[in-house]
A protein has these predicted regions:
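N-terminal glycine-rich phosphate-binding loop and ensuing alpha1 helix
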Residues: 1-58
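Conserved alpha/beta core of the MobA/IspD/sugar-nucleotide pyrophosphorylase nucleotidyltransferase superfamily
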Residues: 2, 156-226
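Residue-level signal for inorganic ion chemistry
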Residues: 8, 32, 89, 103-104, ...
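Hydrophobic packing residues within well-ordered alpha-helices of enzyme cores
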Residues: 17, 60-61, 118, 169, ...
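Short aromatic/basic micro-patch
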Residues: 25, 109, 149, 163, ...
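Conserved N-terminal catalytic core of the sugar/cofactor nucleotidyltransferase
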Residues: 33-97, 177-179
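Residues at the starts of beta-strands that form the adenosine-phosphate
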Residues: 46-48, 127, 196
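Conserved beta-loop-beta/alpha segment of the NTase-like Rossmann-fold superfamily
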Residues: 74, 81-145, 159
Length: 226
């Protein structure tokens, strides 16, 4: 497998949660411990870099030491947006890195198997993201009223880690910065560049913590897996 830098985006404001979801306890350990341990155990991950709030930098180093994380290379202060945080982390990656994986720190149940599978697809296609087929009906709306019903079979929800060829990713980030463009996720960055992104098979358990109900579900799922 190609050498992969695993970036954990953990500098968000957690405004919807009302508290720092990254360090919420799931069965006795911080939520972000899950991604750290999965990346540590993945054969394709060479180094881990965390983009964090300035007030959390030392806490991440302490957590890594407690968990026995040896791949952690840097903890950087994130920016105002996800893209700024990813760019700050990207600057710390080794020159020999061949793939860049960007993962939401608020997805605590990511597995080694998912990381390896998406990395393998990115190695083949240049860009890959884990995805799940949409299951709910999708409506386009305007001013609170339905405009049309979308063809659900053509839509997918995407997860992280999103993995990209390192050279392509660095180039895309540079172009976006020069153009003053800021994207909500890295897949959208590659869409802007016109590069196809492969949809890898996602994991229904790889949920994102956005509200209290997500924490309860994640805790239940993690109990089953231990």
């Amino acid at each position: 497998m190609k050498k992969t830098a695993f970036i954990i985006a953990a500098a968000g404001s957690a405004s919807r949660m009302g508290r720092d979801k990254i360090f919420i306890s799931l069965n006795g350990r911080p939520a972000v411990a899950g991604p750290l341990l999965a990346a540590q155990r993945s054969d394709c991950v060479t180094e881990i870099i965390i983009a964090a709030k300035q007030t959390d930098v030392l806490a991440f180093w302490d957590l890594a030491k407690t968990l026995g994380i040896t791949k952690l290379k840097a903890v950087v202060t994130g920016g105002k947006t996800r893209q700024e945080s990813a760019a700050a982390a990207l600057e710390q990656t080794d020159a020999e890195i061949e793939l860049i994986a960007v993962h939401d720190g608020a997805r605590p149940l990511v597995t080694v198997e998912l990381i390896n599978a998406v990395c393998a697809d990115a190695e083949k296609y240049g860009a890959a993201v884990p995805s799940l087929a949409a299951t709910d009906s999708l409506k386009e709306a305007r001013d609170g009223f339905v405009v049309r019903t979308a063809d659900r079979d053509r839509f997918f929800t995407v997860q992280t880690p999103q993995v990209f060829d390192a050279g392509l990713y660095r180039g895309a980030m540079s172009v976006a910065a020069s153009a003053g463009m800021d994207f909500r996720d890295d897949c959208q960055l590659f869409e802007f560049m016109g590069h196809p992104v492969f949809l890898s098979k996602g994991d229904p358990h790889n949920i994102k913590l956005t509200g209290p109900i997500d924490v309860a579900v994640a805790e239940m799922l993690s109990e089953r897996e231990t």
